[in-house]
């Protein structure tokens, strides 16, 4: 089936079956014969329609003879009318009597008087015609646009074939050799004849030989590029000369319509203007040729024809775009298909649909989770056809017309019928932007008065909806299959868990949380305190009777016979829960986190139905008690801490001290800045803590005895914040504590904090300082929303064809998971990371070596619990990264479907879910940056390591010297300190910073909380390893260092500055008394090079002891961290861009030594134990992070900055790169408190690593440097080995997501993504086949997607259902047995 057939499919059953059986679509270059074959006649005139009769002109652009009749079954002159003459061709006007819709599919053509080059093959870089003829673009354009001649046959002259010569050169050659001595050509004709002469078979052999013979890499690259195009032509049966056209197609007139407007004017498609231009110029050229006009005039006309055709195909690609009457560039054929408004994205991937409507949403607190309120008026419009058919069926209306009238009159019976039609008919609700799949869910409609859609409050978080004027769209699924999918898959009750991380997304929030928190708080001396009850029901009765108060602490015997200490409110909540949830889950104050845990437990243990019922009950009770509590905000709730004044004064004194030190020259400006910011951060934190302390507890007095007791506060703001209903400590601090430090738009923190709170009011200066942060937030929001949406689009495109395709791929490879530690503390335990994954190898008990779990076990909550109990510290799991499936991923490598809680089904679109999970929070976070209001959210710098466990110290690769105070100073950065327990298991591990003081020794037994090492967080010291005398070298004032005198202090510091000349190398050596440089560890001279910004702490010639500090370098000034920095970082990683601050990476393991400098760059040498040393050049001003004599592993960073991903891949391999990418991206999201499962990132990284670069093609058909799909590479190599040829070798390759999307095997998917013309040009040249395996391609050709319920193996499966006997309805019995599980659903 050709593309042509696809787009001319009529609605007959045979054709629809045809489209279903469509196997693939191929795109090739159209030959002139093809174009003539498509055509129904030649368009000879530029006329469109007759201005008097409005009928199309004959042989014009709208000619009825060529394209078909304007009116159904009526010829142009009116001789034949109606169906009876069908198929007759009118002898008078030549029009076939047929349906007018053929004007949508019949094409015409224009025979060109001179050949014309196709602009796509000429201008798409690299130019296809240019590469094939081995000509530069400039030369080719000169020839095509009649600027220069090209030699076709040099004859007896000294010119070479295909040499480009100007008019003057040509005249000189003719003068010299005579006119017949050579043949030259100009324009597309010449290019066409050169293309015709090419013998591609010979050219292929010749290029292959040249490529093997040459040593030059650039030449090899050039030859390979040319060879690729030659091979493409040979394999696709395209002919090179077809890139130059002698006939062009004219698209059907209905696709470029001419529409009459009121007032006798016409609106026309731009294409008509472009076609008219071509026809006019073509006709003029024909006439000039017939008249035998001078050569120069004909040449000019040919050039104009070439330009007109260029504009038709791609206006504006070359030269200035042709504009219409209003100065707007005309829309060419290329513009029709590319971009957001093009055919692909506007009409094929996104369509407007019937049976839909939109309205404002309001909250529906009385709804059940599976319901939504649908306005009656809206329902009437949406369900009209159903109502018509029902009216007819009941005999209330005889025809559809009368039914229509009844509905328009809104008769009473219509509303009754509407009720019935709508009952249990699922409808879909969608809120834009639909960032993840929970943005469309289905509900059962309840008809409501008014015009607003009512939405259940618990689904708001999934939609990210609020009721400040948001609108939502309603869609009605029509077919039975669609309704079943809505009910079974999309119903809100089936979407309780988030696909991004598997935690519940249907979780009570705001008022409900506040109500539940209020219910479960306890309070001293309440009515009925210390009463004992025999069962929970008795508590409820006592409460209803007013015997006990809601917050009273009481004793209750539970069903298992145990007596528990609890409160009345908690028992009331317990009554709502499914019985399998333990009482301990509610015997606590219910905050938002606890409620989420409760819902999650209920889902895992009691199932979906019980959870849905629980959520609805929690919602009702929460609202009721929030109303009863009457929690509200008043100004006096904002209590300003009494100690605030003192804290601020203390901080101010510290800052004054720091300023004084700065004035005395003891510290530099950067240090001062860092310290001041730190003091204020700490002060703000202290004020905040004081405020929370004061606001968080109340003193309650017993009215009878007068006894007093501190209780959890009932302050409204505190309750809202603590419960997680609204607001956080940060906002409370700004309201009642102090606003704290603010950030400038550049991200720097302003040193002066705002010491007032909103309650006290801000001064003018403070208000002005605040505006910085606020405005930055607003600007960021606007910019980043677009950025984030674009990131999501790229992510979706790269993984859109990743589907779960089989159960087990049989891989023996996987990845190792361990705890994620930060500074020695476990940040994310192994059990959390392994949850929902499948074990690759069996897991054994670390102590007894007993088998705990066999391979291929899914790690669920129970398995994870055992891993924690047995203290398993590492497991090997299966991962998407190591899955061997040829297409998609297998079930076992993916693991659990996070949104459903069971192992993933075959056919699940895990790729798109991964893209949505990563993209969605990006948008959310960018929209939320300004919530912190730019208040500097900066953590206080860490300056020591503290033991988290008792144990024994083990030091590795630690070099330390003892200073004059007897303390050990750590040298270098490769030293590590670990703590092991009695069993020899490593409990924590720290990398010791350079210059830190080590406070423990090897093998020392330590206790928990002991300080292990400490350091100056603001400065990095350079510590001497040996005693001796200081000798400066290249430390020259004004050249390499500057004495910076502080105006205020009159003190000077010597700071190393950027030095212009290359031969300076400031360093400090330590010499003996004879002036010889001493040696330190590893036999390296004791010379310390000083980076830019280092501050010298010693004088030339001074005596020095080991462990003394020679110089210090202030650490970087801190900027506020914000996802705004994070989003570009995520995009940078996914796009594999070169980081701005690129680090130098060591490719081998070995010892680092400094080796002087060359060409203005510093040289580092890494010497391995065996093998050759490797040199690295580090640019000036880049800070080297390793010290002389350090040991580095392959892939370790030698300088500060981020490593380039290609370097990581080369030095450490795919697995490490995948882990690095996952960790770096998670870092950004985790910082913002967003949980995304690792597997989503892995799915995307898998797509980035799906290709390899061929190093040696061996006996295969690959080319050197070609990028090949891993699957394809494996298949080809297996085939080659089977036939006794040498297999190819390749190295892994990492592609950015845009690149990976554009190099996908489906050209339809790639074309609809970006660079449409380029993708289509390449694909047509290669005669590419698209096998329609992804989702996008199938949507574009109008089929069901091959995933989910449309997964091909499901669609082609017949299911036999055995007959079942009808069973009597047991509903009432069930109800009696267990009233909790049977509900009014």
From Swiss-Prot:
The record's comment on cofactor binding reads:
Binds 1 Mg(2+) ion per subunit.
An example GO CC term for this entry is:
DNA-directed RNA polymerase complex
Q: Which domain of life is it from?
A: Bacteria
Q: Per UniProt, where does Mg(2+) bind?
A: 466, 468, 470
| GO molecular function per UniProt | DNA binding; DNA-directed RNA polymerase activity; magnesium ion binding; zinc ion binding
For this entry, list what GO says about its biological process: DNA-templated transcription
* EC category name: transferase
Alphabetized InterPro entries for the sequence: DNA-dir_RpoC_beta_prime (IPR045867), DNA-dir_RpoC_beta_prime_bact (IPR012754), RNA_pol_asu (IPR000722), RNA_pol_N (IPR006592), RNA_pol_Rpb1_1 (IPR007080), RNA_pol_Rpb1_3 (IPR007066), RNA_pol_Rpb1_3_sf (IPR042102), RNA_pol_Rpb1_4 (IPR007083)
Which cofactors go with this protein? Answer: Mg(2+); Zn(2+)
Enumerate the catalysed reactions: RNA(n) + a ribonucleoside 5'-triphosphate = RNA(n+1) + diphosphate
One Pfam family, short name please? RNA_pol_Rpb1_1
Where does the chain bind Zn(2+) 2?
Answer: 809, 883, 890, 893
Binding residues for Zn(2+) 1, per the UniProt record?
Answer: 75, 77, 90, 93
Enzyme Commission number(s): 2.7.7.6
Q: Which UniProt keywords apply?
A: DNA-directed RNA polymerase, Magnesium, Metal-binding, Nucleotidyltransferase, Transcription, Transferase, Zinc
Q: Which family does it belong to?
A: Belongs to the RNA polymerase beta' chain family.
**Oligomeric and partner information:** The RNAP catalytic core consists of 2 alpha, 1 beta, 1 beta' and 1 omega subunit. When a sigma factor is associated with the core the holoenzyme is formed, which can initiate transcription.
| Protein role | DNA-dependent RNA polymerase catalyzes the transcription of DNA into RNA using the four ribonucleoside triphosphates as substrates.
Q: What protein name is recorded for this chain?
A: DNA-directed RNA polymerase subunit beta'
Q: Which organism is it from?
A: Nitratidesulfovibrio vulgaris (strain ATCC 29579 / DSM 644 / CCUG 34227 / NCIMB 8303 / VKM B-1760 / Hildenborough)
